[in-house]
Curated annotation (Swiss-Prot):
Signal peptide: 1-34
Annotated glycan sites: P97
Gene: CLE22
Gene Ontology cellular component terms for the protein in this record: apoplast
Keywords, comma-separated and alphabetical: Developmental protein, Differentiation, Glycoprotein, Hydroxylation, Secreted, Signal
Family: Belongs to the CLV3/ESR signal peptide family.
Protein name per Swiss-Prot or TrEMBL: CLAVATA3/ESR (CLE)-related protein 22
Region (Disordered): 37-103
Lineage: Eukaryota, Viridiplantae, Streptophyta, Embryophyta, Tracheophyta
Length: 103
């Protein structure tokens, strides 16, 4: 009966060692893959895959900043004679109700 327990112990030991080696190889593979692709993440993120906001929402495309300032919007300074607060070179910021505050 002593041989049965010693053989069972050696199989369990071999299985444990094999599992540890497989986990170590998996960890090394994932680490090597992550470290080799980290410079490429920055390269691909600035490649120009983002779309302009006008293409995403057709309502924003129809808005004209000159028409909004001529009829008086929140972007004009009423005390200064209707002078635009934001210059034409700056991006347009459309404000509205914040959906995160609707409770």
């Amino acid at each position: 009966m002593g041989n049965y327990y010693s053989r069972r112990k050696s199989r369990k030991h071999i299985t444990t060692v094999a599992l540890i080696i497989l986990l170590l190889l998996l960890f090394l593979f994932l680490y090597a893959k992550a470290s080799s692709s980290s410079p490429n993440i920055h390269h691909h993120s600035t490649h120009g895959s983002l779309k302009k906001s006008g293409n995403l929402d057709p309502k924003l495309h129809d808005l004209d900043s000159n028409a909004a300032s001529s009829r008086g919007s929140k972007y004009t300074n009423y005390e200064g004679g209707g002078e635009d607060v934001f210059e034409d070179g700056k991006r347009r910021v459309f404000t509205g109700p914040n959906p995160l505050h609707n409770r």
